[in-house]
């Protein structure tokens, strides 16, 4: 490990160590599969896979005679076909068999048949948090989606409440503020008046509806109150006699009051609009929206005079026809259907989270009911009305209390739920069979739906992604990513600005910096460093508890909901050893407001300044001195750094480098403390101190030069010697882009900030030749080429060195089997695997058939179908793999074997490669200058790199200057620094270091021109900057074509490097040539170089023969236009001067010749 000097304003030690950075993946999958509990034979919790089985079983037959019951499941871990390494080699999936113990019970006879039933295979997670599917490492990204529960929001003039279940129908209530009516919508179908909906649910009288939502007051009817009564609403119906019936909810008129007085009604019950305050837990309302709806009912159903209430049939008919238009209706069915939509566990599930949110919102303690209750519906309506009246506030949809995270485990649980419901259906069908008594449990279960669902999820789901494996940081960040897209999430086009924006609840939970720059900005984010996901799927972040103004060491994890309205101090607030704050006013935040307050009001305090950003951003020193846009680019570009052959950790780090290396999974860590007894390049053996016997040893296999998903090189190197003592958890071997157990993505270079002869104009970079010679930025890239050997209709294909019409020079590189030898240097066009395919016999002449029968098979024709090195690729063959049917049982039908050849290429830094620092300062290498021509310092040291000073002011990433100043001091003092984010070294500290190292405190030096030896006119800022080489290499982008493939219909050259395509000559290029009057050039480009088929052949022929040429034919695109017009029924033909038809196709030519 490297000794680092802590240089910053804060304390070097943190109260809380960083958690394991990939625990979001590991914990989620462990919750799903509960492997640890299965191994230790402990009882399983009702979550993940266990909960799926418990919910589906028992499956009972229609008549109730037979039941299939679930006992337990287990994973056959010992029967794994391949190890992780073999899976990658052979293109297999790393998975185990899932078996379920089922009991088939015959309730009539009491007989029970038990069987362990095969339930398909289930992919296992590696210790690095990845899955290996078909030989490639994949990551299942966590999804952030809208939490189930209830939300209240406003769109234009509509106030809405929405109850979102985990599974089932959405229920929406909306108040139209122009008309003062309240409607309900189920699954976004037609609106239904709220009172009708309530009647359908059982509030069948006007009185019931009114007493549910309104406070009721009793008023004496007498001369004194006579004037106050008109205009008020009755809460209880009054029946004086046959034709004098006053309904609840009707407005009282002066005439009514007279009638009351005359008929001896002394007391009436009225709606009390002022008594809306919470009375013993009831939530009464103060607006007449519900009463308006009752009035609207009358208009909707023309009630016959004298009828007191709406008939149930009319209500059900109205509600049911809105929900299920066009379906036949019977009243009992209608009632049942409506009840099952929300109140049956089979059709509706709020989920734990939905119930938790509802209870939290309305102040209940119930956390178990998974379906809706009448109380939930009433409370939601009341709350919406209170918001409409202005007594309560709307919800913020983008608040992290309304968004939750679904990780691997939960996503897989949902996949299994869907598949198991299909299994259940099939089992029930099979149970209804007459011969059910002869059945065994395994005959009832169909595995197909499960296998296909799991396969489809891992292979094609938007959330199961090919792992970004450019370097360890890219790997780590990919596993910590949160994605708002995917099934059940948002879509790019419909996501507005608000969803993408930074919200105050993101503090400590999601990084405000790290997100892509393109159309996905803000939809794909990263987890903050200390953040974790709680049981409900909400993001939590840790805080130190502050009691009576004193900071304690007690830690609490708070979700966004818990944190609301709490007063939280920053991590760098000063306090003494007793925890007393030193200032009288401390900077705090309360929800989204930043203010100051006295220590006694503080509830919590941040645990660390880097709490609010992600791992990538926490690797940028002096982050707080950079503009946010550049910090974003810096975070993103560190993930694109190519692992180098000789990387070095940065002189100026942030302290996160060792944490990232440790948790990334690319280094080898000691499992137990002990002594190293063997250390070779490929293997380390440690004898643990607490070894039970002489054979109890820890063996570690070192990975050498393997290919990653992105064709970079995965190579581990040993850090320990034989006889060395190692501690548990100590890093004993480095991985790619790590050095001495620290992340090392690039190298430290001596920098001059100076324009140099225009070579570093516009972000271009000038580099010294020394860097190339010393291989500071040399990386190895490994490409895989594979070929299948198939069984064809005409016979099998063969791998052989005996290939027709191929020169001996090329065949010399192949071994006796026709496969390239390991260690051979190959160039484009070389054969890697010789393969011949039988040719179809087609129209063989009788003479040829005679020859075949005389000389046997020899004369049979074969076609050369060898695997060749594609254009633009060269390198050394480092490995060849042959995978046959004996090795793996599941090769595709018709495939006999697969051959894979690995070609490695050492790539030095060259002009056109992209480089970047950690502050978003990116550029392309424009010139590599000999060392002697580079500007040099007074002591003769030449610079390594020159950057343009104009790259700094407008970009506002001052961090790069501070880093290079401190780096310069560190290089000459032989020190490495930890400069934590948000607590960086001050200018005074940096200047102090520069003075100690013997430099000018401004780090400006006199530079000398390498060409003339003269000093430059002004002093130049000099420093040591950490630069990375990015995965945008010029070798992968350079491309040239002379002739190549053509598009089938238009016969024009294809486009793009992957298709070996040509350059497109677009409209603007044509205009330019027209403007020059370059007629012949233009004609050639638009015809023979593009899509004039006969012209292409003729011109090639003429060039070969050396004949001057001017061929012009008809371009194929003209023929396409002709055929399209003919498709419209317009026959178009062309005639020459003499009136003869010009043939456009060979077929036409034949027809003309015949006629």
UniProtKB/Swiss-Prot annotation:
GO terms for biological process, alphabetical: DNA-templated transcription
Gene Ontology CC terms: DNA-directed RNA polymerase complex
Gene3D superfamilies the UniProt entry points to: 2.40.50.100, 2.40.50.150, 3.90.1100.10, DNA-directed RNA polymerase, beta subunit, external 1 domain, DNA-directed RNA polymerase, subunit 2, domain 6, RNA polymerase alpha subunit dimerisation domain, RNA polymerase Rpb2, domain 2
The source's domain of life comes to Bacteria
Q: Which InterPro entries match?
A: DNA-dir_RNA_pol_bsu_ext_1_sf (IPR042107), DNA-dir_RNA_pol_bsu_external_1 (IPR019462), DNA-dir_RNA_pol_su2 (IPR015712), DNA-dir_RNAP_su2_dom (IPR007120), DNA-dir_RNAP_su2_hyb_sf (IPR037033), RNA_pol_bsu_bac (IPR010243), RNA_pol_bsu_CS (IPR007121), RNA_pol_bsu_protrusion (IPR007644)
- List GO molecular-function terms, semicolon-separated: DNA binding; DNA-directed RNA polymerase activity; ribonucleoside binding
To which protein family does this belong? Belongs to the RNA polymerase beta chain family.
Q: Its biological function? A: DNA-dependent RNA polymerase catalyzes the transcription of DNA into RNA using the four ribonucleoside triphosphates as substrates.
Question: What's the subunit arrangement here?
Answer: The RNAP catalytic core consists of 2 alpha, 1 beta, 1 beta' and 1 omega subunit. When a sigma factor is associated with the core the holoenzyme is formed, which can initiate transcription.
Q: Which PANTHER family match?
A: DNA-DIRECTED RNA POLYMERASE I SUBUNIT 2
Its name, as the record gives it, is DNA-directed RNA polymerase subunit beta
Which species does the entry assign this protein to? Answer: Borreliella burgdorferi (strain ZS7) (Borrelia burgdorferi)
């Amino acid at each position: 490990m490297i000794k680092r000097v802590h240089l910053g304003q804060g304390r070097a030690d943190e109260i809380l160590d960083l958690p394991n950075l990939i625990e979001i993946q590991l914990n989620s999958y462990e919750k799903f599969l509960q492997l640890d509990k299965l191994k230790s034979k402990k009882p399983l919790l009702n979550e993940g896979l266990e909960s799926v089985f418990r919910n589906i079983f028992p499956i009972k037959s229609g008549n109730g005679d037979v039941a299939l019951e679930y006992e337990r499941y287990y994973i056959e871990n010992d029967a794994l076909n391949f190890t992780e390494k073999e899976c990658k080699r052979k293109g297999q999936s790393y998975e185990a068999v899932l078996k379920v113990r089922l009991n088939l019970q015959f309730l009539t006879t009491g007989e029970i048949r038990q069987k362990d039933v095969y339930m398909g295979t289930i992919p296992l997670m590696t210790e690095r948090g990845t899955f290996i599917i078909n030989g490639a490492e994949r990551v299942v990204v966590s999804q952030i989606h809208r939490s189930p529960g209830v939300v209240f929001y406003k769109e234009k003039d509509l106030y809405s409440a929405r109850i979102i279940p985990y599974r089932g129908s959405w229920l929406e209530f909306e108040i139209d503020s122009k008309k003062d009516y309240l409607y309900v919508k189920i699954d976004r179908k037609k609106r239904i008046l709220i009172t009708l909906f309530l009647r359908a649910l059982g509030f069948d009288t006007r009185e019931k509806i009114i007493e549910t939502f309104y406070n009721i007051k009793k008023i004496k009817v007498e001369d004194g109150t006579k004037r106050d009564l008109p205009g008020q609403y009755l809460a209880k119906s009054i029946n004086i006699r046959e034709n004098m019936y006053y309904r609840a909810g009707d407005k009282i008129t002066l005439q009514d009051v007279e009638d009351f007085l005359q008929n001896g009604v002394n007391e009436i019950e009225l709606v009390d609009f002022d008594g809306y305050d919470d009375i013993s837990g009831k939530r009464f309302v103060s607006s007449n929206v519900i009463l308006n709806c009752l009035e609207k009912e009358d208009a909707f159903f023309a009630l016959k005079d004298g009828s007191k209430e709406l008939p149930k049939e009319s209500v059900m008919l109205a509600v049911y026809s809105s929900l299920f238009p066009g379906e036949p209706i019977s009243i009992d069915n209608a009632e049942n259907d409506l009840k099952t939509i929300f109140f049956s566990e089979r059709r509706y599930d709020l989920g734990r989270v939905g119930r938790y949110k509802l209870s939290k919102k309305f102040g209940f303690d119930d956390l178990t009911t998974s379906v809706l209750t009448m109380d939930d519906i009433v409370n939601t309506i009341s709350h919406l009305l209170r918001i409409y009246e202005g007594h309560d506030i709307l919800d913020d949809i983008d608040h992290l209390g309304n968004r939750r995270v679904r990780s691997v485990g939960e996503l897989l649980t949902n996949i299994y739920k869907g598949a198991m419901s299909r299994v259940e259906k099939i089992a029930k069908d099979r149970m209804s069979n007459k011969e059910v008594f002869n059945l065994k449990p395994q005959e009832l279960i169909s595995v197909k739906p499960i296998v296909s669902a799991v396969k489809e999820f891992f292979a094609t789901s938007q959330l199961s992604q090919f792992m970004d494996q450019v370097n360890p940081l890219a790997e780590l960040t990919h596993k910590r990513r949160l994605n708002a897209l995917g099934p059940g999430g948002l879509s790019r086009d419909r996501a507005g600005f608000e969803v993408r924006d930074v919200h105050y609840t993101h503090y400590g939970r999601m990084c405000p910096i790290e997100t892509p720059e393109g159309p996905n900005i803000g939809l794909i984010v990263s987890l903050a460093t200390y953040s974790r996901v709680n049981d409900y799927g909400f993001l939590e972040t840790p805080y130190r508890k502050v009691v009576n103004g004193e900071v304690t060491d007690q830690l609490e994890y708070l979700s966004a909901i818990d944190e609301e309205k709490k007063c939280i101090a920053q991590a760098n607030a000063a306090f003494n050893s007793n925890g007393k704050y030193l200032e009288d006013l401390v900077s705090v935040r309360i929800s989204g407001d930043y203010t100051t307050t006295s220590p006694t009001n503080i509830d919590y305090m941040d645990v660390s300044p880097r709490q609010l950003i992600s791992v990538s951003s926490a690797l940028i020193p002096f982050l707080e001195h950079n503009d946010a846009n550049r910090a974003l680019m810096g975070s993103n570009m560190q993930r694109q750094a190519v692992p180098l052959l000789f990387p070095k950790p940065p002189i100026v780090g942030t302290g996160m480098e060792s944490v990232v290396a440790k948790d990334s999974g690319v280094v080898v860590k000691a499992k137990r403390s002990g002594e190293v007894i063997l250390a070779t390049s490929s293997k380390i053996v440690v004898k643990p101190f607490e070894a039970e016997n002489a054979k109890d040893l820890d063996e570690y296999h070192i990975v050498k030069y393997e290919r990653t998903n992105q064709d970079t090189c995965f190579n581990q190197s040993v850090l320990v010697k034989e006889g060395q003592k190692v501690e548990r958890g100590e890093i004993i071997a480095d991985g790619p882009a790590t050095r001495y157990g620290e992340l090392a993505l690039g190298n430290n270079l001596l920098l001059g900030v100076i324009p140099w002869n225009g070579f570093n104009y516009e972000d271009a970079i000038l580099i010294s030749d020394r860097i190339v010679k010393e291989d500071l930025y040399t990386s190895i890239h490994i490409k895989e080429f594979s070929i299948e050997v198939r069984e064809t209709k005409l016979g099998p294909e063969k791998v052989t060195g005996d290939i027709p019409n191929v020169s001996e020079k090329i065949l010399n590189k192949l071994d006796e089997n026709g496969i390239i030898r390991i260690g051979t240097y190959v160039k484009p066009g070389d054969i890697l695997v010789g393969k011949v395919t039988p040719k179809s016999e087609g129209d063989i002449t009788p003479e040829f058939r005679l020859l075949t029968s005389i000389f046997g098979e020899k004369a049979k024709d074969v076609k050369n179908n060898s695997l060749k090195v594609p254009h633009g690729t060269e390198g050394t063959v480092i490995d060849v793999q042959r995978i046959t049917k004996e090795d793996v049982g599941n090769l595709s039908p018709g495939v006999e074997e697969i051959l894979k050849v690995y070609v490695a290429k050492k790539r030095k830094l060259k002009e056109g490669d992209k480089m970047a620092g950690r502050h978003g300062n990116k550029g392309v290498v424009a010139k590599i200058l000999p060392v002697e021509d580079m500007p040099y310092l007074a002591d003769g040291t030449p610079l390594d790199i020159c950057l343009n000073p104009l790259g700094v002011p407008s970009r506002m990433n001052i961090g790069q200057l501070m880093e290079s100043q401190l780096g310069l001091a560190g290089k000459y003092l032989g020190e490495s620094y930890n400069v934590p984010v948000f607590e960086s070294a001050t200018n005074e500290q940096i200047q102090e270091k520069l003075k100690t190292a013997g430099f000018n405190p401004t780090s400006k030096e006199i530079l000398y021109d390498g060409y003339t030896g003269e000093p430059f006119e002004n002093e130049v800022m000099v420093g040591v900057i950490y630069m990375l080489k990015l995965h945008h290499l010029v070798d992968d982008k350079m491309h040239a074509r002379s002739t190549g493939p053509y598009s089938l219909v238009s016969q024009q050259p294809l486009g793009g490097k992957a298709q070996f395509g040509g350059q497109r000559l677009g409209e603007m290029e044509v205009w330019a040539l027209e403007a020059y009057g370059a007629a012949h050039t233009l004609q050639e480009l638009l015809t023979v170089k593009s899509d004039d088929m006969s012209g292409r052949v003729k011109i090639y022929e003429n060039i070969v023969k050396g004949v001057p040429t001017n061929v012009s034919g008809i371009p194929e695109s003209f023929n396409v236009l002709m055929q399209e017009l003919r498709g419209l029924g317009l026959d178009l033909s062309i005639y020459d001067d003499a009136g003869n038809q010009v043939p456009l196709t060979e077929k036409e030519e034949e027809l003309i010749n015949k006629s």
